[in-house]
UniProtKB/Swiss-Prot annotation:
GO biological process, one term: cell wall organization
Family: In the N-terminal section; belongs to the N-acetylglucosamine-1-phosphate uridyltransferase family. In the C-terminal section; belongs to the transferase hexapeptide repeat family.
GO CC annotation terms, alphabetical: cytoplasm; membrane
Subunit structure of this chain's protein: Homotrimer.
Entry annotated with the keyword Metal-binding: yes
The protein's name: Bifunctional protein GlmU
Region N-acetyltransferase, annotated ranges: 251-456
């Protein structure tokens, strides 16, 4: 029966010795996000009124990383088992709310499965998430009597007969707050590990005549935990495969689903094509008929209809209007804006710069802190010199300007509409509309010039 209120406890106190890392295990990332953040997000989406995070090792790192989440931090100074961890959180439980127990190193648990578990919890009983494995070695076995769940026996404490059981405990369960506190108070550490097992509450509930409802997840990967980097890498591939499948079924053409990484959220239009080894980070929006070439990285950007991004380009915190062309090997840094039909070619870098409608920067240029008008040509090797060693300054270029190759624009500077900047010019003062500007060392010719001889 579903209570209106529910709190979630996430166990995240483990050190993660087998990760061989200074980083707490639950902060290692899957799809660009800390494992524990996946679990927190699921809890919040499920409607948790409070999320209690039980921590131990690396508390400062955890708190700093998760500072934007509304968490109740619960210290487990000694790691004496899952039951002990829940005992630390128990003082915060309300009697009339449900308590859902999750794990910070089980990142792929789905909201849909958790909702089914919550719905299945009997009044006064326990909802328990279980799975059946061909090889259940090392896992706690589910014991039943006449089909009813009677308890969980940890592998080290199980008899030979019990070790033949294939149904195992995932560790995820839900119960009423008052019941949970009462059962937690009765736990002992009289077992092979000398720890307090949360699983012992199943037998306590059964002895009280309470019902235990077992629910199975849709996919085994939902309940797979991470103890080492190999397991984490496998779950990463599972997750990416699932995301790629969803995108393909929604109409996105992934040329090789096995070589696509989604590390955030992708919103897309129709007939989008994505080549191999593309990485999507953060929140990305792709319009209709967008094409992304091989090896591109797109992060927190909006890309308009009919844009074409050539291979090995990096686009971060940028906004592209329709029909823009990028790359190959272009870099759009935060604050880059391209108006309709603009072109940024190979080895061009933009940062906090706007390139106007139909304007082009074809190759080998740096455009930083700049406002560039419509139908402007930026020649190869153009640099907006925006930094004087202490402060940044802006370059403003009007419509229909032609900037020749190897030009330096020393900001702050404004170039008027229709102006022409000759190749090799260093612009240090404002340029009026329709002016021609050039600054060059006079070209000298010396007939019969002899090169210096090399010393032997």
């Amino acid at each position: 029966m579903l209570n209106s209120a529910m709190s979630v406890v996430i166990l995240a106190a483990g050190k993660g010795t087998r990760m061989y890392s200074d980083l707490p295990k639950v902060l290692h990332t899957l799809a660009g996000k800390a494992m524990v953040q996946h679990v927190i997000d699921a809890a919040n989406e499920l409607g948790a009124s409070q999320v209690h995070l039980v921590y131990g090792h690396g508390g400062d790192l955890l708190k700093n990383t998760l500072k934007n989440d509304n968490l109740n931090w619960v210290l487990q100074a000694e790691q004496l088992g899952t039951g002990h961890a829940m005992q630390q959180a128990a003082p915060f439980f309300s009697d009339d709310e449900d308590i859902l127990m999750l794990y910070g190193d089980v990142p792929l648990i789905s909201v849909e499965t958790l909702q089914r578990l919550r719905d299945a919890k009997p009044q006064g009983g326990i909802g328990l998430l279980t799975v059946k494995l061909d090889d259940p070695s090392g896992y706690g076995r589910i014991t039943r009597e006449n089909g009813k769940v009677t308890g969980i026996v940890e592998h080290k404490d199980a008899t030979d007969e019990q070790r033949q059981i294939q149904e195992i405990n995932t560790g995820i369960l839900i119960a009423n707050g008052a019941d949970m506190k009462r059962w937690l108070a009765k736990l002992t550490n009289n077992n092979a590990q000398g720890e307090y097992y949360i699983t012992d509450i199943i037998a306590l509930a059964y002895q009280e005549g309470r019902e235990i409802a077992a629910v199975h997840p849709d996919r085994l990967s939902e309940v797979e935990g991470v103890n080492n980097r190999l397991q984490l890498s496998r779950l990463e591939r599972v997750y990416q495969s699932e995301q790629a499948e969803k995108l393909l079924l929604a109409g996105v053409m992934l040329r090789d689903p096995a070589r696509f990484d989604l590390r955030g959220a992708l919103t897309h239009g129709r007939d989008v094509e994505i080549d191999t080894n593309v990485i999507i980070k953060g929140n990305v929006t792709l319009g209709h008929r967008v094409k992304i070439g091989a090896g591109c990285v797109i992060k927190n950007s909006v890309i308009g209809d009919d844009c074409d991004i050539s291979p090995y380009s990096v686009v971060e915190d940028a906004h592209l209007e329709a029909a823009c062309t990028i790359g190959p090997f272009a870099r759009l840094r935060p604050g880059a804006e391209l108006r309709e039909g603009a072109h940024v070619g190979n080895f061009v870098e933009m940062k906090k710069a706007r390139l106007g409608k139909g304007s082009k920067a074809g190759h080998l240029s740096y455009l930083g802190d700049a406002e560039i008008g419509d139908n402007v040509n930026i020649g190869a090797g153009t640099i907006t010199c925006n930094y004087d060693g202490a402060n940044k300054f802006k370059t403003i270029i009007g419509d229909d300007v032609f900037v020749g190759s190897d030009t330096q624009l020393v900001a702050p500077v404004t170039v008027g509409k229709g102006a022409t900047i000759a190749a090799g010019t260093t612009v240090t003062r404002d340029v009026a509309d329709n002016e021609l500007v050039l600054s060059r060392v006079p070209q000298v010719h010396k007939q019969g010039w002899q090169r210096p001889a090399k010393k032997k």
